[in-house]
Amino acid sequence: MLRSSLGLRIPEGMHDLLPDELALQERAEASALDLFKAWAYQKVVTPTLEYGACIQPVEEEEDSFFKLFDRQGHVLVLRPELTTPIARMVSTRMRGTTFPLRLCYAADVFRYSKSHKQEFRQVGVELIGSASPAADAEVVALAIEALRQIGGMDFQINLGHMGIFTGIMAELGVPQEFQLHYQEKLARKDFVGIERLVKDYGFELKVQDVLLKLPHLHGQEDMLDQVLEWSRRPSLLEAVAALRQVYRYLKDFGVQDYVSLDLGILRGFSYYTGAVFEGYVPGVGFPVVEGGRYDALYGEFGEDVPATGFAINLKAIIEQMACSNAESPEVFVCGSDVSQVIAEARKLRQTGKRVEMCLEPLTREQAVASADRKGIKEIVCVR
């Protein structure tokens, strides 16, 4: 019985990986994981499904999750990211671990999205148990080194701080309703919408000036002097000092040239509390690297420790890279006696060669033609 037309398709936003694509993804992933290991990060794996009670989204994020029910009626969620599941795991399975703890991962995540695929591969790290700006700088530097390691593209890292945004909003005294709308448009880089929103609220000119300039504040360290002209609020001074220190440490790591300070960055997940960053590559209209500090998350799991980390959208990066061929077999073995073909193929594989054996008798000419179509350069015919 033939499958229906629906049975021949895959759900919207999901994808198959053909050999060339998978080979490229696996090489990039292995390269990133080897780098993470060299920086003392240990790989972990969490379940594809988590209880909804673990993920606990804020209202605006909930619609982006894939949800289902188990047989007991509990809400289950396909993991939309790895930071929260790892926080659950560390707080339960690894309680009492010596901090700081460095963990890394490679996994598929699932989110409804208008801008890109709904299933995508991520590699990333979590640095748990340190509030130092050096920890923030380490994860930014590691993200940069990972992008360099994957190779083949230009990229730009934008670095900001959530405390600067909240400090400025507090200084200006804008209504909470306005702040939520402004924050939403700022996260989407909707500059036209921001200008319209600010004008509609009719703030005094000084407040309007700050609100319209903030989204465009990006550059090098001296840009932070502008922020201090707007406010000397203690929380804002602390955030600016922390961001300065992270930026200076990045020079020590030798990666500062890849980084631009950007005070318009607001991460999409609600748990970010300090330094935040995004990475962009040409041809992709959304960040391929997202990360930052989230010091409040572990407290929700009963383990009150600071943390920072990042995730790289490997799928988005690979789509921008030219697919190289998957590793083709090196030797094609054929012959009239299947037992001898099997024996010869085994012998060659034991030497480390990639071997394809012919399953049917072929003439020499047929074998050459078949190997040529497959891109196999060496042919062994056994009698």
Curated annotation (Swiss-Prot):
Which GO cellular component terms, listed alphabetically, does the Swiss-Prot or TrEMBL entry include? cytoplasm
The pathway entry for this protein reads as: Amino-acid biosynthesis; L-histidine biosynthesis; L-histidine from 5-phospho-alpha-D-ribose 1-diphosphate: step 1/9
Q: Name one GO molecular function term.
A: histidine-tRNA ligase activity
Any Gene Ontology biological process: histidyl-tRNA aminoacylation
Q: Which family is annotated?
A: Belongs to the class-II aminoacyl-tRNA synthetase family. HisZ subfamily.
Q: What else is known?
A: This function is generally fulfilled by the C-terminal part of HisG, which is missing in some bacteria such as this one.
| Known partners and oligomeric status | Heteromultimer composed of HisG and HisZ subunits.
What's this protein's name? ATP phosphoribosyltransferase regulatory subunit
Q: Which organism is it from?
A: Desulfitobacterium hafniense (strain DSM 10664 / DCB-2)
